[in-house]
Amino acid sequence: MELHILEHRVRVLSVARPGLWLYTHPLIKLLFLPRRSRCKFFSLTETPEDYTLMVDEEGFKELPPSEFLQVAEATWLVLNVSSHSGAAVQAAGVTKIARSVIAPLAEHHVSVLMLSTYQTDFILVREQDLSVVIHTLAQEFDIYREVGGEPVPVTRDDSSNGFPRTQHGPSPTVHPIQSPQNRFCVLTLDPETLPAIATTLIDVLFYSHSTPKEAASSSPEPSSITFFAFSLIEGYISIVMDAETQKKFPSDLLLTSSSGELWRMVRIGGQPLGFDECGIVAQIAGPLAAADISAYYISTFNFDHALVPEDGIGSVIEVLQRRQEGLAS
């Protein structure tokens, strides 16, 4: 398998809900006029707490500093795994890279963020951790770094500085999980038809906020949750929304897999997770991979979210609770 280090240098930000008005114009520009900003990596995820943005340096320039904007300190690099076989299962998601990428990085104390899209899975690592990433994964993967759009082979010698890293550390924190009742769909869209849904998209993202109060509460099982993720990365669009929100969009423009599968969410974290802890993704992806359960995984500024097939949510909760009990004992 090949591991590609993409050219994007990504910043991770949080826009507080009360300050959304200040960012409506630049966000609309990034959403609908990417050529104007030259942004090639744009992801916006709405949660009950805030709006998380993952944007490259060109996109970051569009966002003015303010009291409503929090910026994670690190610059993140984007990794992508490609398999030589063209028969990859469309919705395997984070499960297919849990053992080969996520677990080894957790063992070497590399903090990762995940962004699963309709098309692929992006793994974000801090720029300063790249040497450890390469050293850790070089045996498993042919590693290439994109330079000027062309893949250049990376050897382990290129990454010898700062390695090895201490391999012992505290046991992973056991984070609580919740499973809201929403049913989600993972969709794509031909970029040429994006203008046709622009009005609806703007309404859903910026003006539709009649969320049940329990969605943002600390109750163990919120009945529903505000969650909408849109990404436009290298010309490909991916949208995650709940089935009720999907009804607002013209059905003939949104494309999904032939099965039209619906997904349920597992939300990870009781308190904001931060960016320094390692192994959070592995805590979820590992057990799902062992049980051969497909999952999309989306990290946000405060919490993590896994999407699993609707008909398997009961067994997923059981698997993860068993894992939690094992870690806690």
Swiss-Prot record:
Keyword Ubl conjugation among record annotations: yes
Effect of residue 14 to A: Abolished phosphorylation by AKT1, leading to decreased interaction with RNF167 and subsequent ubiquitination
Reported impact of residue 261 to A: No effect on arginine-binding. No effect on homodimerization. Loss of interaction with the GATOR2 complex
InterPro entries cross-referenced by the UniProt entry: ACT-like_dom_sf (IPR045865), CASTOR1_ACT-like (IPR049479), CASTOR1_N (IPR040778), CASTOR_ACT_dom (IPR027795), CASTOR_fam (IPR026249), CASTOR_mTORC1 (IPR051719)
Resulting phenotype, residue 292 to A: No effect on arginine-binding. No effect on homodimerization. Loss of interaction with the GATOR2 complex
Tissue specificity comment: Widely expressed.
Effect of residue 213 to R: In 3KR mutant; abolished ubiquitination by RNF167
Record's keyword annotation contains Cytoplasm: yes
GO biological process, one term: positive regulation of TORC1 signaling
Domain ACT: 72-138, 260-321
Top-level taxon: Eukaryota
Molecular function per GO: arginine binding; identical protein binding; molecular sensor activity; protein sequestering activity
Binding-site positions, L-arginine: 111-112, 274, 280-281, 300-304
Subcellular localization, as worded in the UniProt entry: Cytoplasm, Cytosol
Changes after translation: Phosphorylation at Ser-14 by AKT1, promoting the interaction between CASTOR1 and RNF167.
Keywords from the named record: Cytoplasm, Phosphoprotein, Ubl conjugation
Consequence of substituting residue 202 to E: No effect on arginine-binding. Loss of homodimerization. Decreased interaction with the GATOR2 complex which constitutively activates the TORC1 signaling pathway
Gene3D superfamilies: VC0802-like (3.30.2130.10)
Modification type Phosphoserine: residues: 14
Protein role: Functions as an intracellular arginine sensor within the amino acid-sensing branch of the TORC1 signaling pathway. As a homodimer or a heterodimer with CASTOR2, binds and inhibits the GATOR subcomplex GATOR2 and thereby mTORC1. Binding of arginine to CASTOR1 allosterically disrupts the interaction of CASTOR1-containing dimers with GATOR2 which can in turn activate mTORC1 and the TORC1 signaling pathway.
Domain notes: Based on x-ray crystallography data, the protein would be constituted of 4 tandem ACT domains instead of the 2 predicted from the sequence.
Assembly and binders: Forms homodimers and heterodimers with CASTOR2. Interacts with the GATOR2 complex which is composed of MIOS, SEC13, SEH1L, WDR24 and WDR59; the interaction is negatively regulated by arginine. Interacts with TM4SF5; the interaction is positively regulated by leucine and is negatively regulated by arginine.
Similarity section: Belongs to the GATS family.
Name recorded for this polypeptide: Cytosolic arginine sensor for mTORC1 subunit 1
Gene behind this protein: CASTOR1
